[in-house]
Amino acid sequence: MKLCMRPLWLGGLCLASFALSLPHTAQASAAPQLTTETTVDDLQTIQLEAFHKVIIMGNLQVQIVQKKGKPSLSLPPGNHLKEALEVQLDHRDGTLSLRPRKGKEQTCENLPLYLTVNELTDLEILGGGDVDFPKGIQTNALCVQVKGSGTVDFEQAVQTQGNLSLQVMGSGHIELEKGASCLAYEGRINGSGTINTEGKLRCTSKLNAEISGSGRISFEHIQCMAQNIKLQGSGKYYGIKVRASTTQVNILGSGEVYLAGKTHQANYSVLGSGYIDALDFQSEQVEVDGRNPRSTIRCHSDLIIEGKIQNNCTLEYTGKAHLNLEVQDGNVRKI
């Protein structure tokens, strides 16, 4: 499969339009049609064909706004931008890619880009790019991946009819300033990155949060059917105001989980030196599994606490719960 490039010179900016030479049995997608115009803000605007996936490479600064009409990319005019930015539009899967050209990375670092989209289902940041959503976004489903030290900031609420997936691989950061609503939520960190959600997160079904490494996931307000938390390493999870029917917490390592709010049924498992503080997390039924001398589980129950506490693991609890515990060299006390 050959990659053919046809450069387009637009107002001093060179954009590479790509088309793939496919075998004769397959039809190659047409090259994207791009035009330019000058807006009232004297920005150079490039009209784009439809896409729903965006990949941003390098240390670009991009502001994304959802609006009706033809999608576009706007940037300040000037001959110094010549050959600085490479734009690819792949018709096969509807992907728009933005990246600095080789040797032009410093030119693009301070280059503000303004991208308008109709529909956005996937956003991928490769490197240290900064992406900002100043307005709310509505979509069927959304997957955001930060691979590196990049940042994604949603200044207004995110609304999806389906799943909302936020993933950080590295030291990057994702911020939901006004919360979100979705069918199901997935937050995943592999590394030292962070995912922070202010406002209210409403999940019709389940919330899954997973940290591998030293990352942090925090929520200001959660409403969901099922809350599932898994930590491997030294990561931290914060759920401040939680309303969930069921809650499952699994810690493999020295991770820490802090919960407050209310749930009907909770299951807490620590198989390392981890720490769970759920004293302010009201629950009727609690099941515990602690097996390490440096691990601590703190919980609240007004009905029953059952399970195993072994090897000098410490269980501290509040409430009127009946205890049905198998204790082997463990520490259990009411506080």
Where are these regions (language model features)?
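Eukaryotic tandem repeat interaction scaffolds
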Residues: R216-S218, I222-I276
